[in-house]
Curated annotation (Swiss-Prot):
It is an enzyme of class 3 (hydrolase). This is Rhomboid-like protein 15. GO terms for molecular function: serine-type endopeptidase activity. It is a multi-pass membrane protein.
């Protein structure tokens, strides 16, 4: 046995786990772009003149297919590698929130709007009566980076962070982050399409500010597509994420210590947007709860009804809780007293017990909804049990575990 076989197996296992964690659409885009580059490499196809985004060819010969072929072809190994490495984290987060079908629609929409903006700006530069700049009309652009710049703007706008790190070297304000990347890539790399990246940024801001809302169909449209018979083979795949009818501008998890902003896309507003389209139970006294301990409160070993108003509390219980809990003897005494109190009311306990047993097991429908959002089934069952079958609280628990 070779001495490094354990290390090789460990790396292979970690790569497999990383790949299995990437949702269906994001991994499909990575595979498609990688396979296309490999085919071009093996066949020696390196001109890309027939598939690139060429404004002059689109206008003169109406080759609209270039809108979409240009984004899946790449010119070099580093080109496709960097683009796909940037796509995996952003695409995975967006797909887990939106669903696979909705993200596919958004990708096609961004590809279309990027191309239209690119075409308009190139036409204005090439055919204006003041100063004609023909270079943009004959620029042959390829690559997925235009879509990536749109995703960067959307993710930055929705996350609510106030600053972003540029390659781990320095921090910049979140609103300037896409523009800093645009300048950095233009200065550090050759043969970079400035107009293609610029149009991606403009499309991302247009989507973030709601200018594309009239182009985004309702949740019933995506549900109809998912219920089609020809989609069954895709839906059965474990990495496919169902569209749950949510707002495409819903919460995107971030990992920043400062998560506050004055814009309308703050984390709190985004979380309320996510919870608004989840099934809700009847209204409860959520406003009186301590924000540090979300969810329904439960009093152990007591005859009180758990659904009783929060104002009707036991004064003796409050007194015991306010005492110094550092002594083990006091803790044990409080436990014995609480158990003794519960034994004095066996009839009331018997009345409460059937009501609590009815909510022990989470319904299969609730489990399937959370599994369809990309969460692990075992974690879903544990979260639902901890949240007392409250989907909103269960989602909050699962998202905090992922963070």
């Amino acid at each position: 046995m070779r001495p490094n076989i354990v290390t090789e197996a460990g790396v292979q296992t970690r790569v497999g786990q990383w790949w299995n964690a990437i949702p269906f659409l994001t991994s499909s885009v990575v595979v498609v772009c990688g396979v296309i580059y490999l085919i071009c490499l093996l066949t020696g196809y390196d001109t890309f003149y027939e598939v690139c985004f060429l404004p002059s060819a689109i206008i003169s010969r109406f080759q609209v297919y270039r809108f979409y072929t240009a984004i899946i072809f790449h010119g070099s190994l580093l080109h496709v590698l960097f683009n796909m490495m940037a796509l995996v984290p952003m695409g995975s987060e967006l797909e887990r929130i939106m669903g696979s079908v909705r993200l596919l629609y958004l990708t096609v929409l961004l590809a279309t709007t990027n191309a239209v903006l690119h075409l308009l700006i190139a036409s204005l530069a090439g055919y204006n009566p003041f100063y004609q700049y023909d270079h943009l009309m004959n620029e042959c652009a390829i690559g997925f980076s235009g879509i990536l710049f749109s995703m960067i703007v959307i993710e930055t706008s929705l996350s609510g962070v106030t600053s972003r790190s540029v390659f781990g070297l320095f921090n910049v304000p979140a609103k300037l982050y896409p523009w800093i990347l645009l300048i950095v890539f233009q200065l550090l790399m050759t043969n970079v399409s400035l107009l293609g990246h610029l149009c991606g940024i403009l499309s991302g801001f247009s989507y973030s500010y709601g200018l594309f809302n009239f182009l985004m169909p309702g949740s019933s449209f995506f549900t109809t597509i998912e219920s089609a018979s020809w989609m069954s083979s895709f839906i059965r795949r474990p990495k496919f994420i169902m569209c749950t009818g949510g707002n495409p501008s819903s919460y995107i998890p971030t990992y920043s210590a400062q998560n506050t902003t004055s814009s309308g896309f703050s984390t709190g507003n985004a979380w309320r947007s996510l919870s608004s389209w989840l099934p809700q139970r009847e209204a409860s006294n959520q406003s009186s709860e301590d924000s540090r301990f979300p969810g329904r409160g439960r009093t152990l070993s007591t005859a009180r009804d758990p659904t009783a108003p929060a104002g009707e509390t036991d004064p003796n219980l409050h007194a015991r809780l306010l005492e110094d809990s550092s002594s083990p003897d006091r803790l044990s005494d409080a436990t014995v007293n609480t158990v003794a109190d519960s034994r004095q009311a066996p009839i009331a306990n018997a009345a409460v017990l059937p009501q609590s047993q009815g909510r022990v097991a989470a319904s299969e429908e609730q489990i399937q909804k959370l599994v369809a959002m990309g969460f692990d089934r075992t974690q879903v069952e544990v979260a639902l049990a901890a949240a007392d079958d409250d989907l909103t609280v269960a989602v909050e628990i699962l998202m905090s575990q992922q963070a």
